[in-house]
Amino acid sequence: MEKNLRAPIFNIVHGSFVDGWGTRTTVFLKGCPLCCVWCCNPEGQKTTPELKFTQADCIGCGKCASVCPQGAIQWDGKLAFVDRTICNDCLACLDACPTNALDVFGMYYSVDELFRLVECDQDYFGDNGGVTIGGGEATFFPDFTLEFIHRCQQAYIHTALDTCGYILTDAGLEALAQADLVLYDIKGMDSDAHRRYTGVPNEVIRKNLLYRDSLHKDIIIRLPIIPGYTDSQSNLLETADFLASLKSVRRVDVLPVHKYGALKYEQLGKPYIIGGVRLYTPEEEQRLKSIFEQKGLNVQIGG
């Protein structure tokens, strides 16, 4: 396989206690075939670097407006404003900003560069930690992800793949099979509703989960529960029945809605669609958890 594969990455988290077993390094690739209404990582949707503007850090110097070749940055003498209908993410403004109010989501790494970064973390992985590669959607860059998994496994590093399951390539399916652990998102059982809320139907996602399950290798299911979208009683019960029929599911992570992604939407100049959605109470979260526990599943809230 080629050794000069490159992919855009928007975050690398060292010393994570989520996204799999033990202490992990989690890599977030930039680009996803889904566009979920409730996405908490909107910077992971596009496959190219994007301008990040944190207006709270802007000191109103106007230097960015003077260097923007597109005229996409307006300055009113106090603050800068980015016109996203004009901005083409050329990033010419970055060096002009003295406060890093203008920054970038995403940069390219080769497999070698990424592996050297995570290899340094081996000492704190211990017996049950390792590396998780997700996104965005890691299998959107199937050759890169597969090669990275191979490199980690050759170094005896435990690998986890975090995936939405919408995998259409042979290399992506090989990565799904090869990873020591798969964290698999299930967003809904009704395909029409799934298409409305994520942009794609769910038949491929269900098929690929059954494929991974047939290999008798570890799976953690991740369930985003969003009021008005995925929390209907019929969807929850059908999901619980489906998961209970699988043989390789080690845990189900119930992920109640949160608002941690709100700032990222502001930084990208995008509307935050679920801003008005209410949060669950702790008692409601426990009731959601019990739906899956009643089917004999090992369940936790968060993860």
Predicted ranges, named:
Residues 98, 119, 213, 286-289, ...:
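Class I S-adenosyl-L-methionine
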Residues 36, 58, 64, 68, ...:
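Hydrophobic packing within well-folded, soluble alpha/beta domains
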Residues 53-59, 106-121:
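Extended, non-globular alpha-helical segments
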Residues 9-63, 80-89:
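N-terminal pre-triad scaffold of radical SAM enzymes
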Residues 1-21, 225-303:
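Auxiliary Fe-S-binding modules of radical SAM enzymes
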Residues 55, 195-201, 269-277:
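Short glycine-enriched, charge-decorated loop/helix-capping segments at active-site entrances
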Residues 37-44, 63-82, 92-108:
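Iron-sulfur cluster-binding cysteine motifs and their immediate structural context
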Residues 112-261, 266-267:
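Conserved AdoMet/S-adenosylmethionine-binding subsite of the radical SAM
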